[in-house]
Amino acid sequence: MALVILGAFTFTSCDDFLDMQPTNSGNAEGAVGTVADAQVVINGVMSAMTSSSYYGRNLFMYGDAKGGDLTIFAAGRGLDAFYTFNHTSNSNTYSGFWSRGYYCILQVNTLLSNIEKLEESGSMEDFSEAKGQALTLRALFYFDLVRLYGLPYNYNKTSYGVPNVTEPLTVNAQPTRATVEENYRQILQDLSDGAALLAKKKTKQSGYADYYTNIALQARVKLYMEDYDGALNAAREIIESGVYKLCLLYTSPSPR
């Protein structure tokens, strides 16, 4: 009996030992109890963004190749249709924009839901920065999706955009498409809420969403909406903050 118990203990310990989570990134469905846990989840979201189907390659290739800024020579990667406009409905290259974008949104929504539960239970942790980053990232994801799958804002804002999903959904959920106008309204709301939660300073680590990241995205979103005064005001806030400097000459290998 002692050997049986010892064996069971050994196997249990081994399973626990092997089933370790990464310390620098994680899935939002895991346990979140502290600000540090929330940041690990945000790291995981940002890691997911680097997929080749999103910011790791295809998002940039899609726009630049279609705009004539570059030509794709490498064959066999499924990217030829980017510049030939020869799309097919069963190409995984294009569905990746949708699936990766909504995967990132799911992670953000789950994180925000977990934080809300912690706050309601009386947690003393200050999740303001984590929530601000998460809302800013969700705005970015929806901005990317509506630009890819919806018409330009002032061309037909009442036309279909993408589903506005702001909470975790079950696997069988079938959210309906919102209008382009509703998408942009959600984007601006997330940016406004996010900016109010972020400290008005530059993050110490490059690559993370901070207050000025949020304001820069506001400028870009408003530019796409042809709200030129709003875009200018947001851009001016960053320029006049003294935190960043404009590049006088943007050249490779580094701007000057």
Language model features by range: what are they?
Residues 14-61:
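Membrane-proximal, proline-rich intrinsically disordered regions
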Residues 16, 250-255:
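Conserved small/polar residues in nucleotide/adenosyl-binding loops
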Residues 78-149, 195-200:
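Conserved, well-structured interaction surfaces
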Residues 105-108, 184, 191, 235:
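Inward-facing hydrophobic residues that define packing positions of alpha-helical scaffold repeats
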Residues 125, 148-181, 185:
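Short coil/linker segments at helix-helix boundaries
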